[in-house]
Amino acid sequence: MKKRTGRKVITVILVVIVCMFALFPFVWMISTSFKTAGEVYSKTPSFIPKAATMQGYKEMLTTHSTTFNFMQWLGNSVIVSLLTTAFSMIIATLGGYGISRFRFRGRGFLSYFILTTQVLPGSLLIIPLYVIMGNLQLLDTKIGLVAAYCTFSIPFCTWMMKGFFDTIPISLEEAARVDVAGRFRIFATVILPLTVPGLVATGIFSFINGWNEYLFASTFMKSYENWTLPIGIASFSGQYATNWGTLMAGAVLITLPVVIMFLLLQKHLVSGMTAGAVKQ
């Protein structure tokens, strides 16, 4: 009993240490966003703001110029993220269902090939995509950025949905065919309602990819009015000086939608991420 209690205590301590280590940057970000410029550059930094201020948030939300417009960048990020999520979910759902249910030559190779693409860094696609989008005149456009994001979100979402479809018994579809239901009707009315956790997981994955991505956006988007939030917030860091309070306020505003989405959908997200790993 003493050994078990000791192990539990050690486990709890280790978990607390890991959580503190992981959460510290976020807590420090929130704390800094409420500090004054003098307190940020103080020789003795404080964890809790001595004179909390909302000036950073006010500057971030109300500053409008030819080179800085938070609300416009927010709209661009929402549009790009939602379109990326919609296209990725539609294609990944149909592709995952096809690979899971249909038997064809090269099916196994295709499944592993899709998974292998996630091993390669996204930076390898920048030059080919830049050339292709330049030829198609899609550079500095939202639809071009959405297409770029889909290139690395669709493969993983397809693989994840395929694993989720594998857990749904084929007998359900066979029973529906007895009622003379077509394949598309079976897919829409029988299969899809059972894949809600998987759809939520792929949707959140695609949305976060589009919402947080910086490298592709900074490469393909050149006009200030077409920037997304990660590029816009990064531009707030000057060459000679940086207003860290305002910068951290922007970082908090970017993080909030993702945190809220996770808190609201965490039940479906966890079940969706794990269901495909167990074959029934």
Predicted regions and their residues:
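A structural signal for multi-pass alpha-helical bundles of membrane permease subunits
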Residues: 2-280
